A protein has these predicted regions:
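Mixed-charge, low-complexity intrinsically disordered regions
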Residues: 1-81
Length: 81
């Protein structure tokens, strides 16, 4: 696992390792555990809103499960779609 420090960019556009694009709307907190969650929106299809825990959002792609994927991170910040 990388020691690289990554942060979520609000309103940043991210590419998922399965080649779909999302925009981060905000970071929210679980009311009981205070765990951080990333709130993000699909930039395709129904443009639905999703949440994922911040640690998982910023994690590396599982290259054992997805050996053909070249992207290092599950979600990578991009300049444009």
């Amino acid at each position: 696992m990388s020691e690289e420090k990554r942060e979520v960019k609000i309103h940043g556009i991210y590419k998922h390792f399965k080649n779909k694009y999302y925009i981060v709307e905000d970071v929210a907190y679980h009311s009981e555990t205070q765990e951080e969650y990333v709130v993000y929106r699909r930039l395709y299809g129904d443009n639905s809103l999703w949440i994922r825990d911040k640690k998982q959002f910023l994690s590396e792609t599982n290259h054992v499960k997805y050996p053909d994927v070249q992207q290092k991170w599950r979600f990578e910040l991009v300049d444009e779609v």
